[in-house]
């Protein structure tokens, strides 16, 4: 599960699973599938009133913006450009959807003349002409309640966004943009990843994801008056926290190790147990072989044997009657061997 967003009223969460959009109550339970296309749907965002969801879909080739009822139904296409468009947020009045796309750099800006460096645009929810908001990359936009300012994460280079423990001059920072003056303020100016900012309900503090303190991505917080004074909200260690969002009442929502979590102010994280029902899951097949292995390798400790049957790699235990399929690809695997560390 990925691309999780909690609804403004804090009662539901939308997320992406296997290329479709789902919705589940914050208490957990059976998720409702909102899209059923053969295409890939992702990056859902809620309208301020919680009645609509905008998302990206590649059903026409590249990713375009679509909008639909939060209860499901027919999706309506909003953008038609050949570039891929990824939504960030609705404007607070609900009239526009902001999105990132590499459409056209203005003549006065030659800083990012490449498809990998997007610009920020908005499109009316009723459809129509798009309008450029910023000529520089601005991702994960989050407006304050007035609509005059918004937070965003920048992008300075081509580094993989999923890379962990990245430290350099091109790591992402959290910025504040004042639309009335056009001023950009860097709130987390350091050589480390800071991203995915969201306003707290009071509008005076910010939650964001960071790898500071030498660990994995976790949720942190600072006030706008003292952004240098950062407080850790979560302390996960093994895997990174991703896809941070917040409700109007301050309930945080994010993913950890592919699972959904919520967190109330001054409380511990709570896992959201989700039941997913799909009609395209493969039936479990039991395969039995007594011959036909094309190659085999014994692990350095002698406790496992890897072998290839029907073009896929399997591993079996010498101590237990357990065999596990390791690969499942259209290609034929060959030359199996164990690494020195087992």
Model-derived segments and spans:
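Signature of short aromatic-glycine-proline-rich micro-motifs recurring in repeat-based ectodomains
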Residues: 1-3, 138, 288-297
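Mature N-terminal segment immediately following signal peptide/propeptide cleavage
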Residues: 1-26, 297
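Structural signature of eukaryotic scaffold interfaces centered on beta-propeller domains
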Residues: 7, 144, 200, 245-246, ...
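A flexible loop/linker signature enriched in serine peptidases of the S9 family
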Residues: 16-22, 36-41, 48, 54-66, ...
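Glycine/alanine-rich phosphate-binding loops at beta-alpha junctions
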Residues: 31
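Long, contiguous interaction/recruitment modules in multidomain scaffold/adaptor proteins
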Residues: 271-272
């Amino acid at each position: 599960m990925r691309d999780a967003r909690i609804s403004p009223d804090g009662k539901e969460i939308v997320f992406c699973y296997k290329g479709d959009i789902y919705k589940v109550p914050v208490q957990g339970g059976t998720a409702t599938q909102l899209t059923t296309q053969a295409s890939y749907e992702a990056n859902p965002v809620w309208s301020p009133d919680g009645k609509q969801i905008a998302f990206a879909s590649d059903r026409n080739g590249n990713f375009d913006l679509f909008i639909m009822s939060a209860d499901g139904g027919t999706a309506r296409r909003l953008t038609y450009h050949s570039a891929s468009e990824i939504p960030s947020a609705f404007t607070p009045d609900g009239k526009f959807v902001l999105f990132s796309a590499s459409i056209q750099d203005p003549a006065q800006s030659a800083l990012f003349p490449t498809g990998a460096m997007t610009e920020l645009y908005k499109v009316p929810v009723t459809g129509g002409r798009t309008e450029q908001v910023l000529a520089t990359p601005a991702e994960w936009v989050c407006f304050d309640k007035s609509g005059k300012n918004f937070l965003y994460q920048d992008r300075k280079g081509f580094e993989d966004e999923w890379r962990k423990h990245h430290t350099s001059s091109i790591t992402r920072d959290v910025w504040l943009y004042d639309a009335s003056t056009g001023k950009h303020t860097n709130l987390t100016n350091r050589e480390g990843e800071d991203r995915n900012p969201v306003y707290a309900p009071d509008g005076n503090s910010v939650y964001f994801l960071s790898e500071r303190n030498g660990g994995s991505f976790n949720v942190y917080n600072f006030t706008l008056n003292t952004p240098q004074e950062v407080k850790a909200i979560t302390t996960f260690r093994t895997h990174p926290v991703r896809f941070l969002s917040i409700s109007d009442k301050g309930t945080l929502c994010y993913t950890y190790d592919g699972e959904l979590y919520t967190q109330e102010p001054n409380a511990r994280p709570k896992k959201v147990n989700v039941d997913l029902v799909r009609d395209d899951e493969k039936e479990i097949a039991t395969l039995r072989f007594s011959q036909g292995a094309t190659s085999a390798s014994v692990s350095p400790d002698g406790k496992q044997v890897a072998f290839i049957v029907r073009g896929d790699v399997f591993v079996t235990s010498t101590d237990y009657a357990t065999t596990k399929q390791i690969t499942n690809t259209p290609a034929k695997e060959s030359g199996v061997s164990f690494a020195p560390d087992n």
